[in-house]
């Protein structure tokens, strides 16, 4: 079952290397054979080559997880771990973009397209051995996902015209979900994206209103219960996270061998992506999902020696982008505006943002940082998404003259000949640009963006900061002016992006959680995203989402930079590797199927 819910610490010490050195030579006590635990009826059968059980996979993790909770988590260092711990009603095959059975063995849909019925497998178990039933599905939806006291990125997209779905239990193995109207991406989102959570573990946290801290990094690992292929055995902050096979996992291969094949997966925490690459190249880890284009030549040369296989899945869904803080609200704690009013006036002007986009020399970024292995990107959807990409959006090739002309139209020009632009009130155009430390490519892109904008006449203060602090600025404090991050990797269906595009979205980053759209174009985005959600006609959905892309490229609330080619690497003796550019986890999206051939 492939889950799609699927965003800084010191380098581990020699003592930890003794624990995490070679994945195939484990000194941990062997796990109880998976066959000794009862299987669900019927078990899920993986469509893969039967492999060899055993061994330990070693990988590196950039940054510390903030949580092991898939409902409240919203960044990659956490997702890297919790994606292994939980399962959904359905699975999702990334290369083919097809849903498949999961915890549910079957499902049906009514003729009007609004009533969905899921039949769970008999004798499903949580990772602690407790039964998994329809009560857990009901609890997940009614007590967690739709709980107004629990902030989560999923809820934004799980409505029709603002109305929630009705989720009811038919019997212990049957759940019925009724949508207020046709909901086009039902199977991809409801079925494959919503992780089912254990009522027997988390009901008290929901009742006590402490769910936000449930499954936190301070929880005892044995109490973090899920139904995915692995469970947490041990967590040492700033050092490693040791996962062990979930003996109750519901999937087997064609020979009847229970998945996953690996006994353990260990993630050693590293401070940056360079350290991640060094660990792989030195043989201290056995998989690297995040190889950057500028590393390609070195990895290609090393792979020729036969120690590992370099994977080249192609252009993916991820892109770099930066945006300005357009939040018009007042901080209730201070009584002050989140954004300096004079700067807010600049940031909320589309011509200001268009000028910034014209100022960026994307070809220089591609050549100097990505070694030519990237393409310019001007829109929300990358060319890697062949199904939904709109090639007719407005583009912004590097043109400082156009940028200056646009700024002059809104009263921004060099008024005193000092080389710095001022607005109509004489305020110098100056702001801080943040990105996360540890991603050297992104930091280099930020330096080039700063340089390009300064050539335009802005003063830009570049301040890289810790990733978790950056997330807090985006999600909670809104204490920033301009941010550069990556975007993408969450799937291709338009409805998976409602939380970003719709104005009330949890991750509508430039101005999140609006009670009412703050602009006419955001209101139009809301309408279009709701409209495409309510029809099963692909052509109608494509038309609506094409317009969404056109609005975003015209209004540029996010200024996109480049989309890199994707690369990954695995040790040469790893089986069932099916690399894809359509997942952030290019080589390990199907980790339960991976195994060592010898």
Task: Put a short name on every predicted segment.
Residues 155-208, 234-236:
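Surface-exposed binding/hinge segments that line
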Residues 561:
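Active-site-proximal polar cores
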Residues 41-44, 57-111, 142, 225:
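N-terminal lobe/hinge region of extracytoplasmic solute-binding protein
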Residues 3-4, 8, 22-49, 94-95, ...:
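Extracytoplasmic/periplasmic ligand-capture domains
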Residues 201-206, 373-392, 567-572:
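Mature extracytoplasmic/periplasmic domains
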């Amino acid at each position: 079952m492939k889950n799609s819910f699927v965003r800084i610490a010191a380098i581990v010490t020699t003592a930890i290397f003794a624990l995490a050195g070679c994945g195939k030579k484990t000194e941990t006590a062997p796990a109880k054979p998976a066959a000794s635990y009862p299987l669900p009826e019927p078990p899920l059968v993986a469509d893969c080559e039967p492999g060899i059980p055993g061994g330990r996979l070693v990988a590196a993790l950039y940054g510390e997880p903030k949580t092991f909770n898939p409902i409240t988590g919203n960044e990659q260092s956490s997702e890297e771990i919790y994606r292994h711990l939980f399962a959904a009603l359905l699975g999702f095959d990334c290369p083919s973009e097809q849903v498949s059975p999961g915890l549910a063995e079957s499902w049906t849909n009514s003729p009007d397209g609004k009533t969905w019925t899921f039949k769970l497998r008999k004798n499903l178990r949580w990772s602690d051995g407790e039964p998994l039933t329809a009560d857990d599905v009901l609890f997940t939806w009614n007590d967690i996902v739709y709980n107004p006291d629990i902030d989560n990125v999923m809820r934004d997209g799980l409505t029709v015209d603002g109305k929630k779905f009705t989720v009811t239990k038919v019997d212990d193995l049957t759940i019925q979900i009724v949508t207020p109207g046709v909901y086009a991406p039902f199977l991809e989102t409801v079925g494959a994206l919503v992780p089912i959570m254990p009522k027997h573990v988390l009901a008290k946290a929901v009742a006590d209103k402490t769910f936000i801290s449930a499954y936190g990094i301070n929880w005892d690992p044995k109490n973090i219960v899920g139904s995915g292929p692995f469970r947490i055995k041990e967590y040492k902050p700033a050092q490693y996270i040791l996962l062990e096979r979930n003996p109750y996992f519901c999937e087997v291969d064609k020979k009847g061998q229970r998945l996953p094949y690996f006994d353990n997966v260990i993630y050693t925490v590293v401070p940056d992506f360079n350290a991640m690459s060094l660990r792989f190249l030195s043989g201290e880890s056995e998989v690297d999902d995040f190889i950057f284009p500028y590393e390609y030549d070195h990895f290609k040369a090393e792979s020729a020696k036969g120690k590992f296989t370099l994977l080249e899945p192609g252009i993916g869904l991820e892109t770099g982008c930066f945006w300005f803080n357009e939040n018009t609200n007042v901080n209730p704690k201070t009584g002050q505006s989140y954004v300096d009013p004079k700067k807010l006036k600049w940031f909320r002007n589309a011509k200001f943002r268009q000028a910034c986009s014209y100022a960026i020399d994307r070809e220089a970024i591609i050549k100097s940082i990505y070694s030519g292995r990237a393409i310019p990107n001007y829109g929300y959807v990358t060319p890697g998404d062949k199904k939904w990409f709109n090639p007719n959006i407005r583009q912004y090739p590097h043109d400082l003259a156009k940028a200056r002309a646009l700024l002059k139209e809104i009263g921004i020009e060099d008024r005193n000949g000092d080389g710095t632009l001022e607005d109509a009130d004489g305020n110098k155009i100056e702001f801080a640009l943040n990105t996360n430390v540890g991603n050297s490519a992104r930091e280099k892109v930020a330096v080039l963006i700063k340089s390009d904008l300064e050539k335009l006449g802005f003063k830009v203060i570049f301040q890289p900061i810790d990733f978790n602090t950056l997330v807090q600025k985006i999600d909670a404090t809104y204490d920033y002016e301009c941010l550069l991050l990556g975007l993408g990797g969450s799937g291709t269906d338009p409805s998976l992006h409602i939380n970003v595009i719709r104005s009330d979205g949890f991750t509508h980053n430039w101005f999140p959680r609006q009670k009412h759209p703050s602009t006419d174009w955001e209101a139009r985005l809301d309408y279009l995203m709701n409209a495409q959600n309510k029809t099963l006609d692909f052509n109608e959905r494509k038309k609506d989402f094409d317009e969404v892309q056109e609005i975003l490229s015209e209004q540029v609330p996010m200024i996109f930079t480049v989309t890199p080619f994707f690369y990954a690497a695995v040790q040469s003796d790893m089986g069932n590797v099916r690399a894809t550019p359509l997942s952030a986890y290019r080589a390990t999206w199907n980790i339960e199927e991976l195994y060592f051939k010898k």
